[in-house]
A protein has these predicted regions:
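Anion-binding alpha/beta catalytic cores of soluble intermediary-metabolism enzymes, centered on
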Residues: 30-32, 95, 103-175, 266
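Glycine-rich phosphate/diphosphate-binding loop of Rossmann-like nucleotide-binding domains
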Residues: 53-66, 148-226
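C-terminal helix-to-coil terminal segments
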Residues: 280-309
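Short, structured coil segments at secondary-structure junctions
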Residues: 70, 101, 121-123, 179, ...
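Active-site cofactor/substrate anionic-group-binding motifs, chiefly glycine-
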Residues: 47-101
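Rossmann-like adenosine-cofactor binding region
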Residues: 202-278, 283-284
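Positively charged, low-complexity intrinsically disordered leader regions
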Residues: 1-61, 65
Length: 309
């Protein structure tokens, strides 16, 4: 049994095995419909319990299809219907019930502490579907997409992030350290990652550089990532924050500083941080990126169940 909570805590050899398995599984599904089961049904009889404390479209759909295609089933719980939320039941007791009824637990949460507490009391694998500090399933899937399109290992590419510092960027930073790729981050100085993340970068002496100039961050990029400037439940003056990111908006002019074959990726949903003429262009691979979540999350599930070949 293995958990999947934060990329920085998972050996890079395991992360690479997940990517290799996902690549193989995607090839085998070329002629199959969405709900057809993979040969061998490796997770037949297994139940994935999911709980979403934050809104979700891609994570919810992709985990639903992932477990179904592996031959298993899934049940999605709404926190507002549980005693955990309204009846004062403890995480310890809830985790015991989840462990008795299910075979794995996927949590999308507004609390890193809650994620760790569930991990402490569960006797089944736990997967982080998004937390305030990280989004590991998203970034591992994005690495899969980058390597699929570029036909190169990510360690040979120049990766750029332009936008706010958030949980997705934290996981991209962890991936940069794990996979040893160059990462340029373009954001206003005020919106750099937390001191904890900066220390993590410094401790690992990685090829990560910050720029208070979007053009400098984009220069020579093979891939440009972005995310919404106004995140879910972001309690800030929205118009003021958007104004501070004006010079970091991704448009055709900014993309011209990157390599000619640079691709644009965005974890979605989008906001005002990218123009339509980039988001809807041939350089944008956001739909392929979203669909690849299914393939990588299948391999993450197999990893957690100890069934990776």
């Amino acid at each position: 049994m293995k958990n999947f909570i934060n990329l920085k805590d998972i050996p890079v050899s395991d992360l690479k095995k997940i990517l290799i398995d996902a690549k193989r599984r995607k090839k085998l599904r070329k002629k199959l419909d969405n709900l057809q089961i993979d040969k061998g049904a490796p997770l037949k009889g297994k139940l994935l319990i999911q709980m979403y404390e934050k809104s979700s479209l891609r994570t919810r759909l992709s985990f639903y299809l992932a477990i179904k295609q592996l031959g298993g089933s899934t049940l999605t719980l709404r926190p507002d219907e549980l005693h955990l939320s309204k009846g004062g039941e403890s995480i310890q007791d809830t985790a015991k019930i989840l462990s008795n009824f299910g075979n794995a637990f996927m949590l999308r949460t507004d609390s890193d502490e809650k994620l760790e507490e569930f991990k402490k009391y569960l006797s089944i694998p736990i997967i982080n579907g998004l937390s305030p500090s990280s989004h590991p399933t998203q970034i591992l899937s994005d690495i899969f997409t980058v390597e699929e399109i570029k036909k190169k290992t990510i360690s040979t590419l120049n990766i750029t992030w332009i936008g706010d510092s958030n949980n997705v960027l934290n996981s991209l930073i962890a991936a940069s350290i794990k996979f040893s790729f160059k990462l340029s981050i373009g954001c206003p100085n005020k919106y750099k990652p937390s001191k904890k993340i900066i220390r993590y970068i410094e401790d690992n002496k990685n090829k990560i550089h910050f720029f208070n100039d979007a053009k400098k961050a984009a220069k020579g990029a093979d891939v440009i990532f972005s995310d919404k400037v106004i995140s879910m439940n972001d309690k800030v003056n929205k118009s003021k924050k958007l104004n501070q990111f004006k010079k970091f908006k991704i448009n055709k002019k900014l993309m011209s500083f990157a390599k000619k074959d640079c691709i644009f990726l965005h974890c979605l949903p989008r906001g005002k941080e990218v123009d339509d003429n980039v988001f809807l262009s041939k350089q944008s691979k956001v739909w392929q990126q979203a669909l690849n979540r299914v393939h990588v999350q299948k391999s993450i599930l197999l990893y957690c169940f100890g069934k990776l070949r």
